[in-house]
Amino acid sequence: SIDGVGKVWEYIRYPGKWKDLTDSLDAYFSMKNIYIPRMTTVLTALNVFDIDNLKKFNDTLHYRYNKEAPPAELNFQEVYPMDKGTALIHLPKYLLEEALLQTGITDQARGLIQMGIDNNKENHQKVLAEIEMLDFTRNQNYRNFLDKRIVNWLEGNVL
């Protein structure tokens, strides 16, 4: 599962470092009989605005190791449990609607985001509480990693 690119991945997969992941992928794909890289992403409030970067990384990863076939479509999954604080249903509809505008979005990701809109239970406090708990246990600060639209909403700075 690759749930973001660069600093977004480092935030979600703390204490991992992005370079360590890419080095590990280099080593893995240098082995024989590895033909088609496939990437899965759990879509959450933490990475919903990183879909374009994930798409670019997926395409780069694929062409870097297998130039004979087009890149496989990204596989997106829901966060489990579905009522977790970072679940898409807890974001406001306007943010989810903005997330649908990303150019790299797949039908699968679009469906998950649309489910977040259709089943929306916007809950600012629940999202913020989970993120602050993560930050506290990891000595991180979401402001340094997450998309500015999410940060603005978390801080009540809706534009």
Language model regions located:
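Radical SAM/AdoMet-radical enzyme domain recognition
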Residues: S1-H90, L95
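Active-site rim elements
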Residues: W9-Y14, R38-V42, A99-L100, I113-I117, ...
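Extended, charge-rich low-complexity interaction segments
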Residues: P70-Y80, A99-I113
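Radical SAM enzyme core and accessory elements
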Residues: Q102-L159
